[in-house]
Regions:
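Conserved pre-motif C helix in the palm subdomain of viral-like polymerases
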Residues: 1-4, 8-93, 99, 134, ...
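C-terminal reverse transcriptase regions that engage the nucleic-acid substrate
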Residues: 16, 20, 105-233, 372, ...
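Catalytic palm subdomain of template-directed nucleic-acid polymerases
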Residues: 24-25, 62-101, 116-128, 208-215, ...
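Polymerase palm active-site segment centered on the conserved acidic dipeptide of motif C
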Residues: 46-55, 80-140, 225, 229-234, ...
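Acidic carboxylate-rich catalytic motifs and surrounding loops in phosphoryl-/glycosyl-chemistry enzymes
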Residues: 48-51, 57-58, 104-116, 151-153, ...
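RNase H-like nuclease module associated with reverse transcription
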Residues: 209, 244-245, 284-413
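Structured nucleic-acid-interacting core domains from mobile-element enzymes and related host factors
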Residues: 226-252, 321
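Electropositive, glycine- and tryptophan-enriched low-complexity nucleic-acid-binding patches
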Residues: 270-291
Length: 413
C-alpha cells in the first residue's frame, strides 16, 4: 500500500519484518485491516450506514445516504458486490480502487462458478449456477484414470464407505494417494458444495477415507468426478416465480457405520425454487432407532435454519422469512416429539441438546411437518439412491422442477 508524508508529499517506505502470506494468521490480519478501513471510510468519512454481519463476518452491509443498501462479500482477496443500484455499486468499487490495487472481474465468474441469467418464460428470470470450466480442467488431469462408461448416479446404489473397509494395506493407501486421490476428492467436494447437491452424500463418504484410501474409495471418487463432468452444463436454478420463503427438508438413514455405529443424515434449505444450503454428514452420536436418528437430524437442520433466518433478518430481507419455517421430515415419532413434550422408554435417554428443535417450534421459528417418504427431497443426502430416484429428487432440489409451496402437516395422534 502506498503512503505519502502529509506535509512534504514524499512517498514513505516500509520495512517488511515478516512475510505473512501463507501464514495461518495472514487472512485474519488482512480481513481485520480491510474491515477497519471500510468502517473508517464509509461510516465516518462518507457517513454511510455500515454493518458487518454477526451471522457471517465475510458480509458487510453498506447503506448510502439515499437509503440504498448494498452488500459486500469478501473471500480473502476476492470481493463481490451486490445490490439493486448499479451506480452505488460502481461508487463502492471506485472507493476500493482508490485505496487498494484492485482488478475488476466479470461477475458471471467467481471462484470457479459460472452464473447466467435467462428467462424461463416471459417476464420470469432465473439465475443458473454451473461449473463447466472448473470440471473440464479437473477432468483432463485424470481423464486417463476414468472409466469410459458414463455413470447415471454419483455412487453405486447402496454403496457405503468406512475406514478399514476391505482391509487395504499401507502400500495400497500410498498408491492411491500418489495417484491424486485427495485432489479428486477435493474437486468433488467443491462441486458438491456449489452446483451438485446430489453428489453430497457420495462426496461425504469419499472424504472419510481421505488419509487412507482404498480401491473402492478411489473408484467412487472417480465416478463422482465423471458424473459431474458429464453434467457440467447442468447446475442449480433459482426462479423469480419460485417459492419465496425458506423451506427445509431433513432425513436420516438408519444404516450405521460398522466402526462406530453412527448413521448418515442430511438436510437441504430451499429458497426461490433452488437450494441455498445443504449438508450430508455422519451423526455425532449413535442412534438407537430410526426415530432417534431422525430426531437428531431435525435438530441439526433446525440449527441451520435458525442461522439462515437470522442472516436474512440481518440483511433486511425479512420478506423471505416465514413466520415459522416449514421443516419437512418423514418420521411420525420425530415430528410428534418436536411438537409436544412426552417422555417414553424410547426417548427418555435422548441428549438434552437435541431438544433444541422443540424449542424452535415452541417459540414459533419453525413448524415441523410430516411428508411422504417419496416427497422427502433430502433422502438422497442419506444414501446412494437409484438413478430413477436421483433424477426425481435431484431435479426438484436443484430447482429444475417445482417444489411444493405449501405442505400441510399430517394429523398425528
Amino acid at each position: 500500500l502506498r503512503r505519502y508524508h502529509p506535509q512534504t508529499g514524499e512517498e514513505l517506505m516500509g520495512v517488511l519484518k515478516k512475510m505473512i502470506y501463507g501464514c495461518p494468521q495472514s487472512a485474519f490480519r488482512w480481513a481485520e485491516f480491510r474491515q477497519k478501513w471500510m468502517e473508517r471510510h464509509f461510516k465516518h468519512t462518507l457517513k454511510w450506514g455500515y454493518h458487518q454481519a454477526r451471522q457471517d463476518p465475510c458480509l458487510t452491509i453498506l447503506t448510502s445516504p439515499k437509503g440504498v443498501q448494498s452488500y459486500v462479500v469478501s473471500h480473502v482477496d476476492d470481493i463481490e458486490l451486490a445490490g439493486a443500484d448499479l451506480k452505488e455499486l460502481k461508487f463502492i468499487e471506485e472507493q476500493y480502487r482508490q485505496e487498494f490495487e484492485i482488478t475488476s472481474g466479470n461477475p458471471r465468474f467467481m471462484l470457479g462458478i459460472q452464473r447466467e441469467m435467462e428467462e424461463v418464460k416471459p417476464n420470469v428470470p432465473s439465475i443458473n449456477l454451473t461449473q463447466p470450466d472448473f470440471l473440464e480442467e479437473t477432468y483432463k488431469l485424470y481423464q486417463d484414470k476414468m472409466k469410459k462408461t458414463v455413470p447415471t448416479t454419483p455412487m453405486p446404489v447402496g454403496e457405503f464407505l468406512y475406514m478399514g473397509q476391505d482391509a487395504a494395506s499401507d502400500q495400497e493407501h500410498k498408491y492411491y494417494l500418489a495417484q491424486g486421490f485427495q485432489n479428486i476428492a477435493g474437486a468433488c467436494l467443491w462441486g458438491a458444495r456449489n452446483c451438485f447437491p446430489e453428489c453430497m452424500y457420495g462426496t461425504a463418504q469419499v472424504c472419510r477415507l481421505m488419509s487412507k484410501p482404498n480401491k473402492r474409495a478411489w473408484d467412487c471418487a472417480c465416478r463422482i468426478l465423471s458424473y459431474m463432468y458429464h453434467k457440467r452444463k447442468e447446475g442449480i436454478r433459482y426462479r423469480a416465480d419460485g417459492c419465496n420463503y425458506l423451506q427445509c427438508y431433513y432425513d436420516s438413514s438408519h444404516k450405521a457405520d460398522p466402526t462406530d455405529g453412527k448413521a448418515q443424515y442430511g438436510w437441504v434449505i430451499t429458497l426461490m425454487n433452488g437450494p441455498i444450503e445443504w449438508n450430508s454428514k455422519k451423526h455425532n452420536h449413535v442412534g438407537i432407532s430410526s426415530s432417534h436418528n431422525e430426531y437428531m437430524a431435525l435438530s441439526h437442520a433446525t440449527k441451520a435454519v435458525m442461522w439462515m433466518r437470522q442472516l436474512l433478518q440481518e440483511m433486511k430481507l425479512g420478506e423471505y422469512i416465514p413466520d415459522a419455517t416449514p421443516m419437512m421430515g418423514d418420521n411420525d415419532q420425530a415430528t410428534l416429539l418436536s411438537q409436544q413434550e412426552m417422555v417414553t422408554n424410547g426417548n427418555k435417554f435422548y441428549l438434552l441438546d437435541y431438544h433444541y428443535s422443540r424449542e424452535a417450534v415452541k417459540e414459533g421459528h419453525t413448524s415441523t411437518r410430516r411428508v411422504d417418504t417419496k416427497s422427502n427431497y433430502s433422502d438422497m443426502f442419506t444414501k446412494a439412491v437409484p438413478a430413477i430416484d436421483l433424477t426425481r429428487l435431484g431435479e426438484v432440489v436443484k430447482g429444475n422442477a417445482g417444489l411444493h409451496q405449501e405442505t400441510p402437516p399430517k394429523n398425528i395422534e
